[in-house]
């Protein structure tokens, strides 16, 4: 049987390469700053960093290099990451190294990194505990890690993971409709909307095409097609990290800019503790920063 993380890597290669051409790419290469991580100015200067599960574009590594990192090591599971990453990071040539490996067994020495970035990776793993342990192993004492995982609860995730995805897998009509939306074939339904809503139908199709843009469709593919999307309880996650020696953990507030329908949920990334956020999004996207204390 094929491992889930390898299936995910092959899927994401296609998604990431398409993402480069969307406004969403500008968003993901500017997610981090010393300010939103609550770190001192010029924190990354002279730091040796890692972008684990870097994807096919190396967006996180580019973000770190732009912040002044001395050196960034990128790692993912397949050598097809080399060509696009070298192209995307060429202005930082000589300051990054690319590795093929797995979070379950990182190809790095103990106590090697000052800072480890791991965004949206561990919740896809077959053995997430190994991933957390390996991050702890390769961090220097006093080093910091920024980890992002999918949180638990909320009406939106429940609808996605308990209704939409199961129906996608077992109902061929649902699968066909979602595939056509994800493949930007919404205009096939122009006649349907036009017959039922006349001119309003045409406007609706234009609205859907604008706000269900390529960036959003790639996000849908991420959620719907990924074979494994583990969800974490925030308090339990922090408790388990503490046991490993990853302490002083705090959650990061992110001001995220979307140009599509996801703009409606953007406030939930920042005001994650708001009543509306908790009801609709539960623990949300859990973005934390921890320090290795032992």
Where are these regions (language model features)?
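N-terminal, positively charged/glycine-rich alpha-helical extensions of SAM-dependent methyltransferases
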Residues: 1-22
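A short acidic, Gly/Pro-enriched loop at the edge of an enzyme's catalytic core
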Residues: 104-115
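Conserved class I S-adenosyl-L-methionine
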Residues: 47-55, 145-202
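Class I SAM-dependent methyltransferase SAM/SAH-binding core
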Residues: 57-105
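Acceptor-substrate binding/catalytic loop of class I
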Residues: 153, 220-236
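A short glycine-rich, Lys/Arg-flanked "PGG" loop and its adjoining helix->strand segment in the class I
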Residues: 129-141
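Conserved alpha-helix/loop element of class I SAM-dependent methyltransferases that forms part
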Residues: 24-46, 63
């Amino acid at each position: 049987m094929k491992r889930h993380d390898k299936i995910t890597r092959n899927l994401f290669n296609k998604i990431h390469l398409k993402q480069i051409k969307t406004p969403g790419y500008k968003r993901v290469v500017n997610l981090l700053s010393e300010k939103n991580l609550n770190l001192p100015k010029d924190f990354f200067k002279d730091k040796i960093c890692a972008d684990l599960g870097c994807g096919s574009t190396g967006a996180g590594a580019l973000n770190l290099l732009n912040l002044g990192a001395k050196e960034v090591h990128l790692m993912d599971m397949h050598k097809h990451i080399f060509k696009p990453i070298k192209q995307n990071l060429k202005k930082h040539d000589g300051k990054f190294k690319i590795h093929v490996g797995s979070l379950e067994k990182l190809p790095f020495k103990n106590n090697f990194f000052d800072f480890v970035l791991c965004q949206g990776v561990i919740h896809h793993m077959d053995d997430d505990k190994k991933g957390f342990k390996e991050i702890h192993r390769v961090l220097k004492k006093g080093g910091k890690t920024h980890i992002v995982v999918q949180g638990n609860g909320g009406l939106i995730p429940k609808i996605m993971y308990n209704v939409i995805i199961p129906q996608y897998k077992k109902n061929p009509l649902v699968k066909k409709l979602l595939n056509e939306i994800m493949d930007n074939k919404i205009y096939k339904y122009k006649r349907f909307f036009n017959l039922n809503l006349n001119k309003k139908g045409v406007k609706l199709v234009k609205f859907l095409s604008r706000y269900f843009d390529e960036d959003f469709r790639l996000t849908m593919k991420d959620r719907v097609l990924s074979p494994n999307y583990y969800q974490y309880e925030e308090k339990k996650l922090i408790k388990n990290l503490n046991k490993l020696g990853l302490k002083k953990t705090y959650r990061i507030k992110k001001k995220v800019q979307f140009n599509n329908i996801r703009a409606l949920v953007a406030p939930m990334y920042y005001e994650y503790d708001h009543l509306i956020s908790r009801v609709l999004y539960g623990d949300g996207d859990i973005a934390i920063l921890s320090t290795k204390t032992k």
